[in-house]
């Protein structure tokens, strides 16, 4: 006849089940990403969904807003990406690619979660409005210089033709 001593005791099985139960949530939860890692993950997702010919790479990450500690809660993000020289069809990390000279810059906003198991982001990107504003400033300065140059040119033309005008002596 077998006794309890011959087989594993109920206490040992309880301990094994307890340890399994403690490790299961860790496997389901996954790794917690840093704010920057979550944004880089979102950039990878944007590249996968993009119809553009080249990959985009993170150019600038706006400062991290104050956030709660829950990695499952979506966190607001704002960043810019710039077009690289690498075609989207190659299997390469965007961080390995150089930025394309005069490449398209996009301003992106949305949310990311830091829990990698959730793998959640909701990002939308537009052409960088800040670059458009800078272009407007450049065009304004160019217009002012052209206007100033034209005024000087008109005055020189008047002075030149003024020399040939008949003079009346009084």
Curated annotation (Swiss-Prot):
Report disulfide bridges, numbered on this chain.
Answer: 86-97, 108-125
PTM (free text)? Proteolytically cleaved by proteinase PRTN3 into antibacterial peptide LL-37. Proteolytically cleaved by cathepsin CTSG and neutrophil elastase ELANE.
Q: Which parts of the chain are coiled coil?
A: none
Q: Which GO terms describe its molecular function?
A: lipopolysaccharide binding
- Which InterPro entries does the entry mention? Cathelicidin-like, Cathelicidin_CS, Cathlecidin_C, Cystatin_sf
Mark the transmembrane ranges.
Answer: none
Q: Which SUPFAM superfamilies match?
A: Cystatin/monellin
Q: Name where it's found.
A: Secreted; Vesicle
Q: What are the boundaries of the signal sequence?
A: 1-30
One Pfam family linked to the record:
Cathelicidins
**Cellular component terms (Gene Ontology):** extracellular space; vesicle
What role is this protein assigned?
A: Antimicrobial protein that is an integral component of the innate immune system. Binds to bacterial lipopolysaccharides (LPS). Acts via neutrophil N-formyl peptide receptors to enhance the release of CXCL2. Postsecretory processing generates multiple cathelicidin antimicrobial peptides with various lengths which act as a topical antimicrobial defense in sweat on skin. The unprocessed precursor form, cathelicidin antimicrobial peptide, inhibits the growth of Gram-negative E.coli and E.aerogenes with efficiencies comparable to that of the mature peptide LL-37 (in vitro).
Query: What is the protein's name according to its record?
Result: Cathelicidin antimicrobial peptide
Organism ancestry: Eukaryota, Metazoa, Chordata, Craniata, Vertebrata
């Amino acid at each position: 006849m077998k006794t309890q001593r011959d087989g594993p005791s109920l206490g040992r099985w309880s301990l094994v089940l307890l340890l399994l139960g403690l490790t299961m949530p860790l496997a389901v939860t996954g790794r917690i990403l840093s704010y920057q890692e979550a944004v880089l993950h979102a950039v990878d997702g944007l590249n996968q969904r993009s119809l553009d010919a080249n990959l985009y790479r993170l150019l600038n990450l706006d400062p991290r807003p104050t956030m709660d500690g829950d990695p499952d809660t979506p966190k607001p993000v704002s960043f810019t990406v710039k077009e690289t020289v690498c075609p989207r069809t190659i299997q390469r990390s965007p961080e390995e690619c150089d930025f394309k000279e005069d490449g398209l810059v996009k301003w992106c906003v949305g949310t990311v979660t830091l829990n990698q198991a959730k793998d959640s982001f909701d990002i939308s990107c537009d052409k960088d409005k800040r670059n458009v504003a800078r272009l407007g400033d450049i065009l304004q300065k160019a217009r002012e210089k052209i206007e100033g140059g034209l005024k000087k040119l008109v005055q020189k033309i008047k002075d030149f033709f003024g020399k040939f005008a008949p003079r009346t002596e009084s």
